[in-house]
């Protein structure tokens, strides 16, 4: 009997030590390569530290983040965009490989975009057929007369869209959002026609006048049934979703190992205006990502404190 009691006590002590170890492990927060995601990640990290949770930031591509979340080598993604991430997110949540941690108030759109002055050269815009007819105006010296569309490094089927809609464009994939804004600033300064990947919420809408290209309205069948849409031979003969969702995701173990942090994450909620203003702190006001996060954190204490569950304060 005494031996059994000792064994039980030892086992309980072992599990207690394991729980303490898990609670003291760093929460691994994913950072990608666009401003709002990076700053919101650092804001989230600061909130977690008020709960006594140590954090670290894991820089990883959007394509690699899913495996990291599924394996538990990363814990938190604060921005899951419907337009670029819905397929992987939905599949992995359905497979119970990752966890849906809730939805922001913000609604999203990701699409081809142009500055308003381009309409003087191509007056049929924002209709996509006008863009197709005006392709030559978007050519560059090394594009052999093809229009150039500047894409980001995210998972968009732009080349498939160009093929399906028979557009005389080539897709140039840039490495980051910063490189997109370099091209935009250069073109805007000289009033050069440009069409590039843009999204909302984003700081661009507070700095530049412009519009999204209006492609055929998105339907899920556009991605799975060639017969659907304007071209019965190819998929992706449509635009991207409008008024898309912006979600949060975690590893499956996160809610058990970090209960208060998980409950807080579910409460964290940003709207379009907040995300645009946060992005502008970096891309317009030239703050670092960390400084922007600190500034927002200090100026919005009542808001983020309202996200903390009462039992965790």
Task: Kindly label every feature range from the protein language model.
Residues 34-35, 53-70, 173-183:
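Short helix-initiation/N-cap motifs at beta->coil->alpha
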Residues 74-78, 149-224:
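Ligand-binding pocket segment of bilobal, Venus flytrap-like solute-binding proteins
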Residues 97-150:
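A conserved helix-loop-strand patch within extracytoplasmic ligand-binding domains
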Residues 110-121, 244-257, 280-281:
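A bilobed periplasmic-binding-protein/Venus flytrap-type ligand-binding module shared by bacterial periplasmic
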Residues 204-264, 268:
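C-terminal lobe and pocket-closing loops
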Residues 241, 254-255, 262-313:
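C-terminal functional modules
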